């Protein structure tokens, strides 16, 4: 009987133990399920929140956000991420149960009874630590997807791409040679401020995407630059970015910029600076009227802003693109805050040639009466000789000079027209020959301006053997008036978007900005084909530039595809006509596309009116009126005897100016455009 009672006692004990163990295991599984469910809910909501524009850097597991319903592709991506987390959680639960059963079995083998032994559950913190890798990976993937969907032209949240500076080595001319290093970019973590230029950015590497198709290459390249959509002029001369896919510049060739200096810290320009910087403005500046000028030979600070604007047209490689992104530029400062002198420019030409620059850009000039006499019995022939001597010196050194035509709507071949114009500013006793210098010389490439349709800019001078590139127009400004010109967005397609000495960007117009496009294009030709003779280089340019309305127009794709004509100086006219016909077709297609885009944008702007209040219209009108009148008054000084002036206008807007909020109107307009475009896409 005792044996039977003992056996029954053991059986009852085992049954009670199994019951307790089962309840403990079920409790553990329930806790694990709750934790994983909570984890999934938090992460799914955090990811969904990021699709609404959240800037949270990490997933917050402490508070839940309501789910967002969407019919977009983003919802599918989020659902996929949630499924991944569910699957991962299920695996984790099975692992936890298996581990717990092993622990319980071990304890059970050591003792006859576990009725007083409780299983220790895995803590929530431990579970979160084990799932950290899964959560982080999912978050990174989701952020990448969302980042790719963001609108590039958002001035508030854009991150500029900055070209990574590879290891440098100097060639015989002292130019930095980075050609052996692959092209790469760095993406700034900090955002460009409207009030403060970018400095000392922390960056992370971003690889360059490569495609087998030229069209895809161009698209990938240009899409990585936030403000490409606002550069109608660059689209025109590059065939919508095709030239970037055809050839990317090395660091073997440099362009010398004779201008007002440069903002060295500008993120779009800082990685393009060469080894040569020279200030040729003497102490006291122009006519000793600039007390801030110290004569420091290494001072290249751009007080005027013009040099920085010009440099962006050549080498910008960040939020915007120049015609030759990243190509080396050397700086020769001849302007303080206003005007320059011919002897300073002549010295700069010689210095730039000595420094090995194959192309020398001069977006400035003056009118010289080289015969006849003024009231004092003299003329400008000596200044003419100063230019001629310097240009001959540069040509002999293998450098070609590119200079801007004036912005006075003059036919420089009509001397009477030139005389009549000059009489408005100078007292002429005996009229003589008037020239537009330094663009007048045979060895110089003279550059005029066109608008987005290939027509000569309403302000541009014209001349024989000149080449034309986008410089903008003021036709709509004069036609519609100041208020409508801004409110309907004409300036977006009439003026040019370029780098400014604020560290940001600015809208400008003038032949000053057609000239650097030609300079940058010539630098690409020299870099690709190795043409060293300046006269041959000029002929190559003219032979490979299509005629539009009887004028030679810059087309960089044609230049980069013109190798067979590089040394064919006796090409027959039939071949020229065939090539020009093809080039004209390309340009016509580009112009037609641009016109359609402009018409659509103007119509859209009319309907939406930019959502800008009337007070913005009034402010912009005042800004334009004041600046336009100032520029007209400055024309008197620019055309005074002995003065060299820049050949551009900067009216609206000066973005990023920390001293005046009013000119930031352009940023407001473009930001609103970006929002409207994103809404349209959604």
From Swiss-Prot:
- Signal peptide residues on this chain, from the entry's feature table: 1-22
Q: Which residues form the propeptide?
A: 23-195, 656-682
Q: Which GO terms describe its molecular function?
A: serine-type endopeptidase activity
Provide this UniProt record's keywords sorted from A to Z: Cell wall, Hydrolase, Peptidoglycan-anchor, Protease, Secreted, Serine protease, Signal, Zymogen
Set out the biological process GO terms recorded for this chain's protein. proteolysis
Q: In which pathway does it act?
A: Antibiotic biosynthesis; nisin biosynthesis
What does the UniProt function comment say about this protein?
Answer: Cleaves the lantibiotic nisin precursor peptide.
Family named by the database record = Belongs to the peptidase S8 family.
Name of the protein this chain belongs to: Nisin leader peptide-processing serine protease NisP
């Amino acid at each position: 009987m005792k044996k039977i009672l003992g056996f029954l006692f053991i059986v009852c004990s085992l049954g009670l133990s199994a019951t307790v163990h089962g309840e403990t295991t079920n409790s553990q599984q329930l806790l694990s399920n709750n934790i994983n469910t909570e984890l999934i809910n938090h992460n799914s909501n955090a990811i969904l929140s990021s699709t609404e524009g959240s800037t949270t850097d990490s997933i917050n597991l402490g508070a839940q956000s309501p789910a967002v319903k969407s019919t977009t592709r983003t919802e599918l991506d989020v659902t996929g991420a949630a499924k991944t987390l569910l699957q991962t959680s299920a695996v984790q639960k099975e692992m936890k149960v298996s581990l717990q059963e092993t622990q319980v079995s071990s304890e059970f083998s050591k003792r006859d009874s576990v009725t007083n032994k409780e299983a220790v559950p895995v803590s929530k913190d431990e579970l979160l630590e084990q799932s950290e890798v899964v959560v982080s990976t999912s978050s990174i993937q989701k952020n990448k997807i969302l980042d790719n969907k963001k609108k590039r032209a958002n001035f508030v949240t854009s991150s500029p791409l900055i070209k990574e500076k590879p290891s440098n080595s100097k060639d015989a001319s002292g130019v930095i040679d980075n050609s052996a290093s692959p092209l790469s970019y760095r993406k700034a973590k900090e955002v460009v401020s409207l009030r403060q230029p970018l400095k000392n950015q922390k960056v992370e590497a971003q690889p360059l995407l490569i495609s087998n198709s030229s069209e895809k290459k161009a698209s990938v390249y240009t899409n990585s630059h936030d403000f490409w959509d606002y550069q109608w002029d660059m689209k025109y001369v590059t065939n919508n970015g095709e030239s970037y896919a055809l050839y990317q510049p090395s660091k073997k060739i440099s362009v010398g910029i004779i201008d007002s200096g440069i903002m060295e810290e500008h993120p779009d320009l800082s990685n393009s600076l060469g080894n040569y910087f020279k200030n040729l403005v003497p102490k006291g500046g122009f006519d000793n009227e600039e007390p801030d000028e110290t004569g420091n030979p290494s001072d290249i600070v751009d007080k005027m802003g013009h040099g920085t604007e010009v440099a962006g047209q050549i080498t910008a490689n960040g939020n915007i693109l120049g015609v030759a992104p990243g190509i080396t530029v050397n700086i020769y400062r001849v302007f303080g805050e206003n005007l320059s002198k011919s002897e300073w420019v002549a010295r700069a030409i010689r210095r730039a040639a000595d420094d090995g620059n194959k192309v020398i850009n001069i977006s400035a000039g003056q009118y010289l009466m080289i015969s006849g006499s003024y009231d004092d019995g003299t003329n400008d022939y000596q200044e003419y000789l100063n230019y001629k001597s310097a240009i001959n010196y540069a040509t002999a050194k293998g450098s070609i000079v590119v200079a801007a035509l004036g912005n006075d709507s003059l036919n420089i071949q009509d001397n009477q027209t030139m005389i009549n114009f000059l009489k408005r500013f100078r007292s002429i006793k005996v009229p003589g020959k008037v020239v537009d210098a330094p663009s007048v010389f045979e060895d110089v490439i003279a550059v005029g301006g066109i608008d987005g349709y290939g027509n000569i800019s309403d302000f541009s001078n014209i001349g024989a053997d000149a080449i034309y590139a986008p410089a903008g127009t003021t036709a709509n400004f004069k036609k519609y008036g100041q208020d409508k010109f801004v409110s309907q967005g004409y300036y977006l397609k009439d003026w040019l978007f370029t780098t400014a000495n604020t560290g940001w960007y600015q809208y400008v117009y003038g032949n000053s900005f057609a000239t650097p496009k030609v300079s940058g294009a010539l630098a690409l030709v020299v870099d690709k084909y190795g043409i060293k003779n300046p006269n041959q280089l000029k002929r190559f340019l003219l032979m490979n530039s299509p005629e539009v309305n009887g004028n030679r127009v810059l087309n960089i794709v044609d230049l980069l595809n013109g190798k067979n004509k590089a040394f064919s100086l006796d090409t027959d006219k039939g071949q020229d006509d065939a090539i020009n016909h093809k080039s004209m077709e390309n340009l016509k297609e580009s112009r037609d596309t641009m016109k359609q885009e402009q018409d659509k944008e103007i119509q859209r702007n009319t309907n939406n009116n930019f959502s800008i209040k009337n007070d913005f219209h009034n402010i912009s009108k005042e800004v334009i009126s004041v600046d336009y009148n100032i520029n007209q008054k400055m024309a008197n000084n620019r055309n005074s005897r002995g003065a060299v002036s820049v050949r551009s206008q900067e009216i609206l807007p000066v973005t990023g100016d920390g001293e005046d909020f009013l000119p930031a109107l352009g940023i407001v307009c473009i930001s609103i455009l970006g929002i409207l475009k994103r809404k349209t896409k959604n």
